[in-house]
From Swiss-Prot:
The keyword Repeat does not apply. GO terms for cellular component: extracellular region. This is Serine carboxypeptidase-like 38. Belongs to the peptidase S10 family. Its main location: secreted. Glycans are attached at N233, N317, N357, N423, N449. GO terms for molecular function: serine-type carboxypeptidase activity. One of its GO terms (biological process) is proteolysis. Residues 1-20 form the signal peptide. It is found in: Secreted. Its EC number is 3.4.16.-.
Length: 487
């Protein structure tokens, strides 16, 4: 599926991009939770349009003239606004859309999801990872990301479920049903968002569509893709492929294989690993001894270690700078970058420019709603996505799974264990892949159009930690070309 194109075009892109020098910010910062939805009034104009004129007016209304602090020389268009996902309209998801730098009628549409569940794709995906801008240390100004994925595609980021980021419900405590219905209702709302967004942007109907993301998007993406295929006889969406980085696909299998990564990177001793394997084994669980050894393996609680990239520094000072830091290189890590994004998106002039927070929500924008995560039912978190992946591949949907090789949250050892359970035949053996002469990682192809790749030196957020390799990986996938096998 997808058209073959000459890799030399991509090689030229990466050669020119490699000359760019920008600041690179990296880490995973947690924010307190909030409860969303109480006492809000919804604007029902965001829901179904009744005429082409209304569709056009809604689209024009969403056009972002210019983001505050945006650098000069930006030619691509940006949009932001709300799309209702139920009828009567009470649940509204916020989106941020950036057109491709060099758009054409064949340029694909790509949806991006972050995980959580309960984390913002606008905050993380658009402004920290693969969007066209990143936020300076002053929390007010932006700088270009030369490796933005809108070099190759039209990029659509939206925040869901309701109560995440700027998304909300006008029905009090509506968010509570997401704790009960969780994955199912989220998938339904995500589907209705896409259908209604395409009504507002009808020029993208019939385009090749790809769905990408990371982490708990390992649930969001397969479930949305499944609904799209099941309902394509009603509303056709030209889904060509899905790609998921460091994905949560089968929590139980992943949990059994995380400690191999922890041991191999020197985070625990061989003695402790052997003791853990002995007393915490599911079949021979020791109720007295396992709780004693368990804390040594709960590295996510170590405030001195970034579990999302074990080699990245942690943020020690959350204070914004009065002036932007001087430019360094895009590969340099700023562990406090999430604080800059939070300050930027909570600015009133930014919200006004992005057509966000139009109802004046009674809480500030946060990167993650941890309360929503806490009430998400365990049965959904534990559910395996492997059967859905098999169904999607059976319908001809191409699948790319990739892992940053220094992520301890969902390490490559866990993902490879899940892929092993799929019992797929390897068609192209394990081999290195390259970007601009540098080793990008390793890859393997399976039957039925599934590719797995590791990304050297990256943590949980591959487009953040290794933006050049990430763009190479993404471009190869949507062009349906092999990853370069030679330097």
């Amino acid at each position: 599926m997808g058209k073959q194109q000459d890799w030399s075009v991509t090689a030229c892109i990466f050669l020119s991009l490699s000359l760019a020098s920008q600041i690179h910010c990296s880490s995973q910062t947690h924010f307190p939770s909030h409860k969303g939805g109480a006492g809000l009034s919804g604007d029902t104009s965001h829901f179904n349009s009744v005429s082409r004129e209304n569709v056009l007016s809604l689209k024009e209304k969403d056009l972002i003239e210019k983001l505050p602090g945006q650098p000069s020389g930006i030619s691509f268009r940006q949009y932001g606004g709300y799309v209702a996902v139920n009828e009567p309209a009470t649940r509204f998801l916020y989106y941020y859309f950036v057109e491709a730098i060099k758009p054409s009628k064949s340029t694909p549409l790509v949806l991006w999801f972050n995980g959580g569940p309960g984390c913002s794709s606008v905050g993380f995906g658009a402004f920290e990872e693969l969007g066209p801008f990143r936020v300076h240390s002053d929390g007010k100004t932006l700088y270009r990301n030369p490796y933005s994925w809108n070099n190759e595609a039209n990029m659509l980021f939206f925040e869901g479920p309701i109560s995440v980021g700027f998304s909300y419900s006008s029905t009090p405590f509506d968010w509570e049903i997401f704790g009960e219905q969780a994955d199912k209702l989220t998938a339904e709302d995500n589907y209705m968002f896409l259908v209604n967004w395409l009504e507002r942007f009808p020029e993208y109907k019939g385009r090749d569509v790809y769905i990408s993301g990371q982490s708990y998007a390992g649930h969001y993406i397969p479930q949305l893709a499944q609904i799209i295929l099941h309902r394509n006889n009603q509303t056709f969406i030209n889904l060509r492929g899905i790609s998921i980085g460091n994905p949560g696909l089968d929590l139980l299998i992943e949990a059994d294989n995380e400690n191999k990564f922890i041991l191999s990177h020197g985070l625990v001793s061989q003695k402790d690993f052997e003791e853990y394997s002995k007393v915490c084994d599911f079949a021979n669980y020791d109720m007295d001894e396992c709780p004693k050894i368990m804390p040594k393996f709960s590295i996510e609680h170590n405030k001195h270690l970034d579990v999302y990239n074990i080699y990245a520094p942690v943020c020690l000072n959350s204070t914004l700078s009065s002036e932007p830091k001087k430019c360094t290189t895009i590969m340099e890590v700023d562990p406090c970058r999430s604080n800059y994004v939070k300050a930027y998106l909570n600015s009133e002039n930014v919200q006004e420019a992005m057509h966000a927070n139009t109802t004046k929500l009674p809480y500030e924008w946060k990167a993650c709603n941890h309360y929503l995560n806490s009430v998400w039912i365990d049965a959904d978190k534990d559910a395996s996505m492997v059967p859905i992946l098999h169904d999607l591949m059976g319908e001809g949907v191409r699948v790319l799974v990739y892992s940053g090789d220094v992520d301890a949250a969902i390490p490559f050892t866990a993902t490879m264990a899940v892929l092993k359970t799929m019992n797929l035949t390897v068609v192209n053996e394990w081999r290195p892949w390259f970007t601009g002469g540098q080793l990008g990682g390793f890859t393997e192809d399976y039957e039925r159009n599934l590719t797995y790749a590791t990304v050297k030196g990256s943590g949980h957020s591959v487009p953040l930690d290794q933006p050049v390799h990430a763009l190479n990986l993404f471009t190869s996938f949507i062009r349906n070309t092999p990853l370069p096998q030679t330097p």
